[in-house]
């Protein structure tokens, strides 16, 4: 059924369904009889009811008449604008790494007129805030810089699939792994980029050693190797898009899409204007990072991060593309979050020195192998906190005096800039406590001194034996045996949520029945199906932004 046409009829139908969902129509047989007469199957009815309930809960406008921006230009009987304020081949919604890549790819693949609409005052998004790490196997840089000559897309795929814990679509992961080497070469050629370093991530407890390689490439400006990071990508990509004739509008929020009588996406509503897209619309508007309502309903870890931790992504990441897509029947999936311990950069890559510590819960017990890729042990921290304290639960990083002389990446080390001041500030605000004995530390934390001492004794014995029999840790088997002792109430830094609209290998956004929504494409973390319940290591999201943005732009340009 056409989603847009006949707004009055749509509003009436949505109102009726909501009334039914609220129990105002009590006789299920009467309800099913009525919808059967309208040609709807029970399966589609139930799917629609679930969608209506979810969208209503998330504050979506799927059951309203056309939004304010649509009404501004007037609509005809089909629900389409009476006139368009601009006409393009491809419209890209979102000007971060994936969106700019999609725009360039569309132009490169034959689209003559491409428009990028960015909600913020400038392009870049969270990509511009990122370290600039991109994963790939078998590249010239991996061979030349890291000396890795035995990697392959197959090993890379198996690495990603293992960390996904079975909660991804294998064809999407395979697509990313196979395309990754060429994507990096294309990125370098298209955006004046090189890669100045290649390093690796840490494993998870169930990862096979044979799947591990140094694959993380650091984005660097080919004209100035002092410039690194995601901002190099977005800056250079924006320039490349504009040089190819692409148009970019900032301070422009996309609020809806238009579909014709066949369900084909034909344009977007943005601000008070409506723009026609003859070939396709690409959603690259990130995930639900700062949308508390959607996180509450779909992503428990992201909600916890918003309420109690620190979310460091672009504030414009409010799931706009996901909300709009769901309102038009798109399928979705939500899993977890991308968290790290920024104060120590713990286990973010295998070139960083690590400080001696263990993680403990509110009872003083270890609960995870600490030397795992950062989002894995951060997920365990979330689970441990929730298990013992709910939304107000917490975990602790337990250290001894060696922390004060650790590497400068530790925020409280004397070797860090203002490290001693940072340590004193943490002690003053109570986020860190210090004591000369473990029993004294436990008392300050409100936990059993006997239990905490037993935990540390067991850890120290494992260090002496050279084997962590409890969890299998291999890095920094260093005893905590020198007073004073410190416990820091951990605070995760969130650099993104995991969840979005389901796509296929052509970056087409799928509806709840698994069918592509015609002329609607997705890139980056606006999409889902290629990331599992936690982040499998630096460079995965940027490869996802690159891969799906590149494919989405090309697919849209090729649309008929």
Task: Identify the residue ranges that each predicted region occupies.
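Conserved redox-cofactor binding core of oxidoreductases
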Residues: 176-272, 292-293, 463-482
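N-terminal secretory signal peptides
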Residues: 1-41, 51-58
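Glycine-rich loop(s) and the adjacent beta-strand/alpha-helix scaffold that form part
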Residues: 276-343, 551
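Glycine-rich FAD pyrophosphate-binding loop
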Residues: 109-127
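An anion/pyrophosphate-binding glycine-rich loop and adjacent beta-alpha core
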Residues: 322-324, 328-447
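Core beta-strand elements of the Rossmann-like FAD/NAD(P) dinucleotide-binding domain
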Residues: 86-88, 271-280
């Amino acid at each position: 059924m056409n989603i847009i046409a006949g707004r009055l009829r749509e509003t009436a139908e949505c109102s009726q369904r909501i009334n039914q969902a609220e129990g105002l129509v009590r006789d299920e047989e009467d309800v099913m009889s009525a919808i059967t007469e309208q040609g709807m199957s029970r399966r589609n009815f139930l799917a629609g009811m679930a969608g209506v309930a979810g969208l209503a809960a998330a504050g979506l406008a799927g059951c309203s008449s056309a939004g304010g921006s649509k009404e501004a230009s007037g609509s005809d009987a089909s629900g389409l604008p009476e006139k368009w304020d601009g006409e393009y081949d491809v419209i890209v919604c979102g000007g971060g790494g994936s969106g700019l890549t999609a725009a360039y790819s569309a132009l490169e693949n034959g689209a003559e007129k491409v428009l990028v609409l960015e909600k913020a005052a400038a392009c870049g998004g969270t990509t511009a805030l990122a370290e600039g790490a991109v994963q790939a196997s078998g590249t010239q840089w991996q061979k030349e810089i890291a000396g890795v000559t035995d990697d392959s897309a197959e090993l890379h795929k198996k690495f990603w699939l293992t960390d996904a814990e079975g909660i991804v679509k294998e064809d999407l992961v395979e697509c990313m792994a196979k395309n990754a080497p060429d994507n990096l070469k294309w990125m370098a050629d298209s955006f004046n980029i090189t890669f100045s370093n290649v390093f690796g991530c840490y494993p998870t407890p169930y990862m096979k050693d044979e799947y591990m390689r140094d694959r993380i490439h650091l984005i660097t400006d080919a004209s100035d190797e002092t410039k690194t990071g995601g901002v190099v990508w977005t800056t250079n990509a924006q320039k490349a898009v504009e040089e190819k004739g692409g148009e970019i509008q900032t301070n422009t929020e996309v609020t809806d899409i238009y579909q014709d009588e066949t369900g084909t996406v034909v344009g977007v509503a943005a601000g008070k204007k409506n723009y026609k897209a003859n070939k396709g619309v690409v959603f690259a508007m990130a995930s639900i990072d700062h949308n508390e309502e959607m996180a509450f309903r779909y992503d428990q870890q992201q909600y916890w991060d918003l309420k109690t931790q620190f979310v460091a992504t672009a504030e414009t990441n409010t799931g706009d593309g996901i909300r709009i897509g769901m309102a038009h029947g798109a399928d979705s999936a939500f899993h977890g979050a991308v968290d790290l311990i920024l104060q120590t950069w713990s286990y973010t890559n295998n070139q960083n020195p690590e400080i001696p510590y263990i993680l403990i819960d509110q009872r003083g017990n270890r609960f995870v192998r600490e030397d795992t890729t950062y989002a894995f042990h951060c997920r365990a921290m979330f689970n441990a906190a929730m298990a013992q304290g709910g939304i107000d639960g917490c975990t602790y990083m337990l250290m001894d005096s060696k922390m004060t002389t650790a590497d400068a990446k530790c925020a409280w080390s004397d070797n860090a800039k203002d490290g001693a001041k940072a340590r004193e500030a943490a002690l003053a605000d109570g986020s860190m406590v210090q004591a000369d004995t473990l029993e004294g530390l436990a008392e300050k934390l409100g936990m059993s001194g006997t239990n905490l001492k037993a935990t540390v004794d067991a850890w120290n014995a494992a260090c002496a034996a050279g084997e962590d029999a409890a969890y299998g840790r291999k890095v920094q088997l260093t005893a905590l045996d020198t007073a004073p002792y410190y416990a820091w109430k951990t605070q995760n830094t969130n650099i993104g949520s995991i969840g979005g609209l389901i796509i296929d290998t052509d970056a087409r956004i799928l509806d709840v029945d698994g069918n592509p929504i015609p002329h609607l494409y997705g890139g980056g973390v606006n999409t889902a199906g290629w990331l599992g319940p936690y982040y499998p290591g630096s460079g995965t999201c940027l490869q996802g932004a690159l891969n799906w943005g590149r494919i989405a732009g090309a697919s849209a340009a090729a649309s008929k």
